[in-house]
């Protein structure tokens, strides 16, 4: 499956997507460039599919793509993914996120988009 390099090498691209994926789970909606949103959408849909299985193996697979930091005193990012987000989509077979195009960025005119969970 082809993917966008996002103007970065492999390690930088992984770190960027990992940070964006963590932010998306915490905030449930973020505004980023259109190309980053399209790449993040692929990863986010895979993560929700993993979280619906809810086994030890899928938790470890999901942890590879997240920074498992604390959101508040009780919850971590991984717990929010596996408890809150996956429970919303138990009867849904895919298409967990939506990319909405917005106005270009003011400084350089880069096409922007909002990615959010449906």
Curated annotation (Swiss-Prot):
Keywords linked to the UniProt accession: Ribonucleoprotein, Ribosomal protein
Keyword Ribosomal protein (UniProt): yes
Superkingdom of origin: Bacteria
GO molecular function, a single term: structural constituent of ribosome
BP term (GO), one: translation
GO cellular component, one term: large ribosomal subunit
InterPro entries, alphabetized: Ribosomal_bL17 (IPR000456), Ribosomal_bL17_sf (IPR036373)
Similarity comment: family membership: Belongs to the bacterial ribosomal protein bL17 family.
Protein name: Large ribosomal subunit protein bL17
Organism: Onion yellows phytoplasma (strain OY-M)
Lineage: Bacteria, Bacillati, Mycoplasmatota, Mollicutes, Acholeplasmatales
């Amino acid at each position: 499956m082809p993917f966008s390099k996002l103007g970065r090498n492999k390690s930088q691209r992984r770190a960027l997507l990992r940070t964006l994926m963590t932010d998306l789970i915490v905030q449930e909606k973020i505004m980023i460039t259109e190309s980053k949103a399209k790449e993040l959408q692929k990863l986010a849909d895979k993560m929700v599919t993993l979280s619906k299985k809810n086994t030890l193996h899928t938790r470890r697979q999901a942890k590879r793509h997240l920074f498992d930091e604390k959101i508040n005193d009780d919850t971590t990012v991984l717990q929010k993914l596996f408890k809150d987000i996956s429970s919303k989509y138990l009867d849904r077979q895919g298409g967990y996120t939506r990319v909405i195009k917005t106005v270009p960025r003011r400084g350089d005119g880069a096409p922007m988009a909002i990615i959010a969970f449906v």
